[in-house]
Design a protein with these regions (language model features):
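Histidine-centered catalytic micro-motifs
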Residues: 4-14, 38-41, 131-135, 195-197
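Metal-associated gating/positioning segment near the N- to mid-region
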Residues: 13-48
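Histidine/acidic-residue-rich catalytic or RNA/ligand-binding cores of hydrolases
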Residues: 15-18, 47-51, 140-147, 167-183, ...
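Extended substrate/RNA-proximal surfaces in nucleic-acid metabolism proteins
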Residues: 29, 42, 47-159, 214-223, ...
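Residue-level detector of anion-binding/catalytic polar loops
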Residues: 34-35, 156, 190, 219
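C-terminal active-site rim and adjoining tail of enzyme catalytic domains
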Residues: 162, 181, 194, 198
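Short acidic/histidine-rich active-site segments
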Residues: 189-203
């Protein structure tokens, strides 16, 4: 499978990543990607940047080291209604938004129903484009319901390659993805593969994700990574680059 993009990455601005924006873009260019996306953690993540950071993306060149760049965010889902940690004013200024559950940012004692409702609620927000790493058994959800809702609301579900790595802190990712991806095939839900890179060497590292898709015989037509125009159908700012 041709893999042209990586939209879930972090730089030093996120507080626990280790390279600059220019270094990450350089790595993406060297690895032959056609598009690089930077998605810093939104403010509720301990140590991340202030919300004002997301209001000044106009100063950033949209081609860096020869590769087109999108500037987005990884929002934190804060409660079981799907509330997130950047206001609409900021979301309208950025290129795209990923919304994810993170253990430091939400009650860790919820039920499957609670976390499912969190995902379903956030998908009703038209300014959110991708659901990040829906795979963590510490924050379990009804993955079939999540896949069905993503198809209904025209959201991309992320297959996070880092979640599948042996050193990942997320629990049960492969088993959860097997359920989620099976449901995606049932409902025709599109997915995006991302690295979740916090260091330049991991930009575009989608190896674990590709292995899982091959094991499941997942249809390539439901993966947006081989086609920028296919991804642009979910991310309007990308359409403006084509």
């Amino acid at each position: 499978m041709i893999d042209l993009l990586d939209l879930h990455t972090h730089t030093i601005a996120s507080g626990h990543a280790y390279n600059t924006l220019y270094e990450m873009a350089q790595s993406a260019a060297e690895k032959g990607l056609a598009l690089y996306g930077c998605s810093e953690h939104a403010p509720a993540m301990p140590g991340s940047c202030h919300k004002f950071y997301f209001s000044n993306f106009d100063v950033i060149p949209r081609v860096i080291r020869g590769i087109p760049v999108l500037m987005g965010t990884e929002l934190n889902i804060l409660d079981h209604t799907g509330r997130v940690d950047l206001e609409e004013h900021y979301l309208q200024k950025i290129d795209y938004a990923i919304a994810s559950l993170h253990t430091p940012c939400i009650d860790n004692h919820g039920t499957v129903s609670d976390y499912t409702n969190a995902y379903l609620g956030v998908m009703e927000n038209p300014l959110i484009h991708i659901i990040g790493h829906p795979d963590d058994s510490r924050l379990p959800a009804d993955w079939t319901a999540v896949a069905a809702a993503a198809a209904k609301h025209h959201k991309l579900l992320e297959l996070n390659s880092h979640s599948l790595a042996p050193n990942s802190s997320r629990k049960g990712a492969r088993e959860n993805y097997e359920q989620l991806l099976t449901a995606c095939m049932r409902y025709g839900t599109s997915i995006i593969i991302d690295s979740d890179a916090h260091c330049e060497n991991d930009v575009g590292n989608h190896e674990m994700a590709h292995r899982l898709l091959a094991d499941l015989h997942f249809p390539e037509e439901l993966v947006v990574n081989p086609s920028l125009s296919k991804a642009a159908a979910f991310i309007p700012s990308l359409a403006r680059l084509l």
